[in-house]
A protein has these predicted regions:
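Short polybasic amphipathic segments
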Residues: 2-9, 183-188, 273
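Charged, alpha-helix-enriched surfaces in structured cytosolic catalytic cores
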Residues: 13, 40-44, 55, 59-62, ...
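Conserved NTPase motor "head" modules and their coupling/switch loops across ABC/AAA+ ATPases, GTPases
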Residues: 82-225, 234-238, 242-250, 254, ...
Length: 330
């Protein structure tokens, strides 16, 4: 009891068995951290994509994280050096494999990102992306397309662990391994996280998401489901057009938005629109559910656009949405 279980057609399945079963790409305002946030955000995004494409990627990452936690405990507890060296042997095995997976995947992703970024900016800016494993100490841009074999990765990782072992013991935490791999984006040669404008950073994230969806389709031969959570308000007109053009290409998409004016009549006409009105509290008791009125039938595209234009094209709040009330509470 209390343990999460997964069933597929009534049969129990491991979490790894479900990876990629329904491939999807999620785009939310929080994803802007991909361009300007911590390096761990980019590593997590790359691993999430890799886990959808390959169960091995998911399993290797899971194994590495277990080994890393164990090693960090040993370092924190000032365990004997022999124990740490023994743990390093296991870390090299799964760590080198994970970095190899990442490098090969990122090479494909970066090429697609560059193409989409050029399209978004009408060719006025160039995007480069660099992946550098933790054992390298060079400029990420110099290794944007470099991949390496498993044996090479194991040797390089083992050498780096031996070289920095003393520093790890002093700082009481692991410093070398896939948890320290670097991913950088460059716009016309400048680091996007440090020097990119907000608009440029948003273009980087949009290019990442479009490339992610394309890569899933190319490798799995299956179109992913797109989940777009209120991102239109975060994009300017040019970036919205690029995203709308992509989702118009026969790909199942779920979108939340407060302004239907972001979409053209053709897209609205083909969509099934569900509108939520202002929530009505049914109880003052803390924890009680709030009820919404929901319309489950399509809304005429012209009516939807007309209502949006009457609001001056500005994002509408739930109370400003056209009435979509059903009989009774949904």
């Amino acid at each position: 009891e209390g343990k999460k279980k997964h069933l597929l057609n009534g049969k129990p399945k491991r979490t790894a068995d479900l990876k990629g079963l329904v491939p999807s790409v999620t785009f939310t305002p929080d994803d802007l951290e991909l361009a300007k946030g911590a390096m761990s955000v980019r590593r997590a995004a790359l691993d999430a994509l890799g886990s959808q494409l390959s169960a091995n990627h998911y399993l290797i990452r899971r194994d590495y994280e277990k080994v890393l936690r164990h090693k960090n405990r040993l370092l924190k507890d000032e365990a004997p050096a022999a124990l740490v060296r023994a743990m390093n042997e296991t870390l090299v095995t799964c760590g080198a494999q994970l970095s190899c997976y990442r490098a090969a995947l990122f090479e494909k992703l970066a090429a697609s990102m560059a193409s989409y970024y050029a399209e978004i900016t009408d060719g006025h800016e160039r995007l480069d992306a660099g992946f550098v494993p933790s054992w390298e100490e060079h400029d990420p841009l110099s290794f944007a397309t470099r991949t390496f074999g498993r044996d090479e990765a194991r040797e390089a990782l083992a050498d780096a662990l031996a070289r920095r072992g003393g520093e790890e013991r002093v700082r009481k935490r692991a410093l070398v391994g896939p948890h320290a791999d670097r991913i950088e984006f460059f716009i016309d040669g400048k680091n996007a996280a440090l020097f990119g404008s907000q608009g440029q950073q948003r273009s980087v994230v949009l290019a990442f998401k479009l490339a992610e969806a394309t890569l899933i389709q190319d490798i799995l031969r299956q179109k992913p489901v797109l989940l777009l959570d209120d991102v239109m308000s975060e994009l300017d007109a040019a970036r919205r057009r690029a995203l709308v053009a992509f989702i118009s290409g026969d790909i199942q998409t779920f979108i939340t938005t407060t302004n239907l004016a972001y979409f053209d009549d053709d897209l609205l006409g083909a969509a099934r629109i569900v509108e939520l009105e202002k929530p009505r509290v049914t109880s003052e008791t803390p924890g009680e559910e709030r009820m919404f009125h929901v319309k489950h039938s399509p809304i005429d595209a012209r009516s939807a656009r007309g209502a949006a234009e009457e609001r001056g094209g500005r994002p509408s709040t739930p109370t400003e949405q056209p009435s979509a009330r059903t009989e009774g509470d949904a």
